[in-house]
């Protein structure tokens, strides 16, 4: 059963991956599943900022 993600632009994933951040948009990642969690919706261009929010990569502080 999917958990509720409380922050905007997050989605629950049963097979956790490697999230992009403002510091590194694409994070090299193995194919093994990490623990299930809420992750930023990478397919829509969202990455995790320093405050833990999911924002568009182009909106990251320069």
Curated annotation (Swiss-Prot):
Keywords: Disulfide bond, Protease inhibitor, Secreted, Serine protease inhibitor
One protein family per Pfam: TIL
Domain TIL: 5-60
Paired cysteines (S-S): 5-38, 15-33, 18-29, 22-60, 40-54
Location of the protein in the cell: Secreted
Molecular function terms, GO-annotated: serine-type endopeptidase inhibitor activity
Gene Ontology CC: extracellular region
Family statement drawn from the similarity comment of this UniProt entry: Belongs to the serine protease inhibitor-like (TIL domain-containing) family.
Name of the protein in question: Trypsin inhibitor
Organism: Ascaris suum
């Amino acid at each position: 059963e999917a958990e509720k993600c409380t922050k905007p632009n997050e989605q629950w994933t049963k097979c956790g991956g490697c999230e992009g951040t403002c510091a590194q948009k694409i994070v090299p990642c193995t194919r093994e599943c990490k623990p299930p969690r809420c992750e930023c919706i990478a397919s829509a261009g969202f990455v995790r900022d320093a405050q833990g929010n999911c924002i568009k990569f182009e909106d990251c502080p320069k």
